[in-house]
Design a protein with these regions (language model features):
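A conserved beta-strand-to-alpha-helix junction within the catalytic ATP-binding
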Residues: 77-91
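Conserved micro-motifs of the catalytic ATP-binding
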Residues: 71-76, 115-119
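Glycine-rich ATP-binding loops of the HATPase_c
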Residues: 205-214
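Short helix-loop "hinge" at the ATP-lid/N-box region of the Bergerat-fold HATPase_c
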Residues: 134-135
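Conserved catalytic submotifs in the C-terminal HATPase_c
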Residues: 77-80, 99, 104-114
Length: 225
């Protein structure tokens, strides 16, 4: 029953997410057909068209990524990756957005370098998706904790934040396709971020799980050495 419900929700949500930018694009194209439009208004409409087109492009790319990952039809380029350094690099790319979201990140990493055989691009995407998810859904003016602990077999990474939304959802559902933490779907995004992150972790022999304790949201990633 749960599986059928999630399939129905998936179809409904993907239809909604594809239709919304397409409808906007069609509407603004029709508006641009007016020869009497002022230059400034025309520029404004073209700007909206560009943003909606990019939104549609990103959604389709995410669909393609998660489809490939689910089928296992992905080529991995395994190299030595300094996992903690990569996590910091991704954070620096999004530091401005973190400040805009009024969040404070706290990192606790091993003092020694932890290198693993990973696909650096796909591992970057894992943490990019996780940070973006936190920026979108974390409660403003709170701390985000990113902890990495080296083990005999590899590394365990935890990302913890307080959610701005009530999390009335099963943790495992959040890593399914098109499931979001905000049931009202008020934030932009494909709803595929956590699903892609989990798929890319699993493709590299790792694990990604979600834990929820009231409004505390935690993602745990395990990579083997």
């Amino acid at each position: 029953v749960r599986s059928q419900r999630m399939k129905t929700e998936l179809i409904t949500n993907v239809s909604h997410d594809l239709k919304t930018p397409l409808t906007a694009i069609t509407t603004y194209i029709e508006l641009l057909e007016d020869d009497n439009l002022a230059t400034e208004v025309r520029k404004e409409y073209l700007g909206v068209l560009k943003r909606k087109s990019e939104r549609l492009k990103f959604l389709i790319e995410d669909l393609f990524e998660v489809s490939k990952a689910s089928s296992g039809n992905v080529t991995l380029n395994l190299v030595e990756v300094d996992i903690c350094n990569l996590m910091r690099q991704v954070y620096l790319e999004y530091e401005d957005r973190v400040e805009e979201a009024d969040l404070i990140f706290r990192f606790r990493m091993p003092e020694e370098k932890v290198t693993l055989q990973l696909d650096s691009q796909k591992t970057y995407r894992i943490f990019e998706n996780l940070y973006v998810n936190i920026i979108k859904y974390a409660m403003p003016h709170t701390r985000v904790y990113v902890n990495a602990n080296k083990t005999k077999k590899g590394i365990v990474i935890e990302l913890k934040n307080m959610s701005a939304n009530e999390l009335n959802i099963q943790p495992e559902e959040l890593t399914e396709r098109f499931v979001r933490g905000d049931s009202a779907r008020n934030t932009e995004g494909s709803g595929l971020g956590l699903a892609i992150a989990r798929s890319f972790a699993e493709l590299q022999g790792g694990k990604l799980s979600v834990e929820i304790d009231w409004d505390l949201f935690k993602v745990v990633i395990v990579f083997q050495a």
